[in-house]
């Protein structure tokens, strides 16, 4: 990509500050890949049905513990999300669950269809893996990070839209997560500076959409001294957002001309 002089200057200034996000003491993961969302992502009514079919309080408690709220990319917006009342059945291979300890859940999966859920690569089944038929396609060895506060975002978007998600909320693939509750990082990611830099690393699709892959987001240089940005709430007001933009322009030492360029940039 050939950059104009002002674009070269902006890029140079961004890269002169801090270190890439991927080099911080945090992890960036993708959301849960089930291999069959129709079976593993359920609504409130189906959740209630599965729980009501449990034969004991212990079974119900075990089952309820692995059915967790989930967000999709379309549910996530800048500094917020609109939960659609959906849940994921978290039978992750990393948990090494015994399906016989979850009779109601086992029957639900069998009613859905063993041949559709088995991970053999056969026609009509899920792709071949070493996981069991009732488990998700990915092992999700990092499931504990979903049980902590985190930053999440939709993978494909017209503009970067990051939000804080509380402990216990999951996201489905390809939505990524950053296992941190650092609000300063959240505010940096939602800035015009970050959006410009991240989009410069890939190709904008037809209609202006961009795929905010972890490999791109992880390359964003993050200043080392940004703790004072944590004074702003996880859902700032419009006035606070404007203040954050100005402060982040200052952090990256952008000139008035460069700020105006980013403010008026169209993709």
Regions of interest found by a model, annotated:
Residues 1-229, 250:
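Polybasic, glycine- and aromatic-enriched phosphate-binding surface used to engage nucleic acids
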Residues 191, 226-267:
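Amphipathic alpha-helical coiled-coil/heptad-repeat segments
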